[in-house]
Amino acid sequence: MTEPARRFDVRVGSSTDGLAPVSFAERSLGAGPLQWVALAAIALAAVAADQLTKHIVSSQLALGDGVHVLGPFWIHHVRNSGIAFGFFSQATAVVIVLTGLAVAWMLVYFARSGARHPILPVALGLVIGGSTSNLLDRVRLGYVTDFLDLRWWPSFNLADSFIVVGVLILLATLVYAERDPRRPRTISDATARPS
C-alpha cells in the first residue's frame, strides 16, 4: 500500500530563493542553543540589575523618603502591590498568576520562534527578566519596590522599564517585518491579489 501524498505548503523569498516544506521552515524557526543562551543572559542581567537597585534603595532610603536627582527626576522609595506603574495594586494574587502565565507563554513562544529574528532574545529577555524580577518580589514580599519618580507618572523600577523597552523593541520589529519587502513569503502570499 502506498503512503498518501503529503501536502506541503512552501515558502519563497529566502536568501537562497529555494523552496522548503513548511514543516522544515517552521522547525528552523525554533530557538537554538545560542538563542537560549542569549535570552537567559539578558533575562538574568535584567533580574540582577533590578534586584540590586531595589536593595540599594530599600537599604539607603526609608519608605516614603525621596532624593531629588535632576529636574523632575527623583529617587522615591515606595511599595507597589500591583503591576507596572502601580496599576491593579489591590489584586496581588491575580497579578502573580497573570505574570506567571505571561512568562510561561513567552518561553513557549520563544521555543517555537526564537530564531525568527535576531532581536527576539534581546526583546523577550528584557520582558521575561523584568517580569520575573517583579514576580519574585511579589511572591517573597507581597509587593515590589518602586523608586524611579518623574512626578508626572506613577513611580516605577528598572523591571518596569525593561518590560516597556522589550515590548517597544518587539513592536518595532513587527512593524519593520511587515514593511520589509525582502521578508519571506508563503506561496499563498505571493499569488494573492488585492481585491
Residue ranges of model-derived segments:
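Alpha-helical transmembrane bundles and membrane-interface segments of multipass inner-membrane proteins
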Residues: M1-S195
